[in-house]
Amino acid sequence: MDIFYNLIKCLIFSTYWLLIANITFRVLIKRRNIPYSMSWLLTIYIIPFIGISIWFFFGELYLGKRQKKIANRIWSISNKWLHELKSCTYIFQIKNSEVATSIFQLCKNRQGLHGIKSKKIKLLTNTKKIMQILIRDIYLARKNIEMVFYIWKPGGMADDVAIALIDSAKRGIHCRLMLDSAGSIEFFQSPWVEIMRKSGIQVVEALKVNLLRVFLRRVDVRQHRKIILIDNYIAYSGSMNLVDPYLFKKSSGIGQWIDLMTRIEGPIATTMGIIYSCDWEIETGLKILPQLPNKKMLENQSNKNASIQVIASGPGFLKNMIHQALLTAIYSAKRELIITTPYLVPSEDLLEAICTAAQRGVEVSIIIPLYHDSILVKWASRVFFSELLEAGVKIFQFQKGLLHSKSILVDQQLSLIGTVNLDMRSLWLNFEITLVIDDSDFGRNLFCIQNKYISDSQLIDKKAWSMRAYWKRILEKIFYFLSPLL
């Protein structure tokens, strides 16, 4: 019996160290940044067995086999469609402002398209008004409505949007709705799913969370995009989930979520449509390529000099594209750089770029929420403050709710707006979308909004920050160790 137990112990011990060696090898060959690799290695060494389990759940970036196979196939189809889109020369804006030239050249070289013209582009900040405008657009739709959201929470104004969609589907409008399985769990447990499907709306649960699948694909890769497309002509994107801000996470005591959305008319809906079609095909296997734009889309154009690029990220999409775009935008700044983000856990490269911008004379401001829905991210963010403040960066903490907007403004000319947070999850894992907008009028509007955020914020004092309690510094360091994994 003793021999049997010794054999079992020897087998467990050998298996454990083989797993440790295998994971160590996989971490090292990935060529990721050193803090990220060190965090994983320390996790699996310091926390036996649990660390290995965490790695298998969250360490490797991959989709399920079926989705991965579809993702590889659709790019050949998408590339053919993009080649046809290039023949629509009337939609492209070839020239860009000086500050935007580098980032648009990056997008052109990697994505194959010049910036897209827009007929009309508008910034929206009031959630109630956004919902009202959206409902109006839904009722005016003539052909199709396509949506993707991370969170759809039933109740309040979200139900008004649901009713508008159902009414539109009943009058023959082709409606598609794709929602993240984890973010919209309350929606998928509600009667709305069956009601919508009975009315003719195609509802898809993206990246479905299933305990039987946790060993087949990474469970924390999420569909974080927020896109609304109507009639291949109107496009919405930004930070807003489909929730009523008066009801969403009301019990948390952090106040209303403050969001930012863009509403654009014109051929940009087509390029956003190809992203939506890729996501839809990955989930369903069905092709829904958008129609090519026509010249009528740009009649009576109000933003004649505006140029827009759409950048998408996620498994199967261009690697590091959003990260490269953010770095390019920051290094392009000459006078002023304003960053708004709810989560500030930047990569080493982004942190260095932001600090360098301040040190070469650019006025750099970062606006983050004072109140947070994530204790982990809140403390992980604080460890970067000292380095940023030392470089001359101004850090503002927004006091009137949870600032959920994600935006970057460079020299009041180049704007980046979308779903991307400055954290590892947005930069490397999730399905995200960012609009890169080269337009001075739009930039001035965004500047006014960001200034309003600043007026409702408190500035962190460098001297006071350096005198914070010692236990807080220790806690920050602990979460800094975890920051590459957040």
Curated annotation (Swiss-Prot):
Classification via InterPro entries: Cardiolipin_synthase (IPR022924), CL_synthase_A (IPR030840), CLS_N (IPR027379), PLD-like_dom (IPR025202), PLipase_D/transphosphatidylase (IPR001736)
EC number of the protein: 2.7.8.-
Matching CDD domains: PLDc_EcCLS_like_1, PLDc_EcCLS_like_2
Transmembrane segments: 3-23, 38-58
GO terms of molecular function: cardiolipin synthase activity
GO (cellular component) term, any one: plasma membrane
Domain PLD phosphodiesterase: 219-246, 399-426
Biological-process GO terms, alphabetical: cardiolipin biosynthetic process
Compartments (UniProt record): Cell inner membrane
Main subcellular location of this protein, as a coarse class: membrane
Residues the record marks as active site: H224, K226, D231, H404, K406, D411
Membrane topology: Multi-pass membrane protein
Enzyme class at the top of the EC tree: transferase
Keywords: Cell inner membrane, Cell membrane, Lipid biosynthesis, Lipid metabolism, Membrane, Phospholipid biosynthesis, Phospholipid metabolism, Repeat, Transferase, Transmembrane, Transmembrane helix
Keyword S-adenosyl-L-methionine: no
Catalytic activity: 2 a 1,2-diacyl-sn-glycero-3-phospho-(1'-sn-glycerol) = a cardiolipin + glycerol
Family: Belongs to the phospholipase D family. Cardiolipin synthase subfamily. ClsA sub-subfamily.
Its job: Catalyzes the reversible phosphatidyl group transfer from one phosphatidylglycerol molecule to another to form cardiolipin (CL) (diphosphatidylglycerol) and glycerol.
Designated name of the protein: Cardiolipin synthase A
